[in-house]
Amino acid sequence: MLYLDTSAFLKLLVDEEHSSDLRAALAHATVWSSALLDVEAHRAARRLGLPADVVAEYLEAVTLIVLGDHTIASAREVRSDSLRTLDALHLASAMELGADLDAVVTYDRRLAQGCTAEGCKVFAPGRRDGWWSATTD
């Protein structure tokens, strides 16, 4: 299973660098994300002038994880001090998948660093492994 964060999801909606790589990688994947994705994606779509039905269509392919008490408690305890609130909630949601989690799909440097600190594999189609630890990319 792959966990998709908002930075990756938006690449599905808007053609930008690595969008085609991501679409190809997700073509036959089982994809999960936090219920946060619903709100974040719709808010971003409004800013970008994209119709809500486009977001809803892409969200249909994603199983959303409810933000329960356990997930919120886990988000408080993530190791990375630089991880912001919503990214900590994404990471905690991904960790809810346990051993079934193959990788967190993200193009967000802080989240990628937080994932590796927690022992989660990071996958960013089109980017080289370890891109998040480089000073330039």
Describe the role of every protein-language-model region:
Residues 61-81, 87-93:
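Acidic catalytic patch
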Residues 28-31, 61-63, 98-103:
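Short active-site oxyanion
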Residues 34, 96-137:
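Acidic, PIN/NYN-like endoribonuclease modules and their adjacent C-terminal/linker elements
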Residues 4, 33, 66, 85-88, ...:
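Short beta-strand scaffold positions
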Residues 8-9, 37, 71, 90, ...:
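Alpha-helix capping/helix-boundary segments
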Residues 54-55, 63-64, 69, 73, ...:
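Alpha-helical scaffold domains
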Residues 19, 38, 52-55, 72, ...:
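A general structural signal for well-ordered alpha-helical segments in protein cores
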Residues 1-33, 45-57, 130-135:
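Short, well-structured N-terminal submotif of metal-dependent ribonuclease cores
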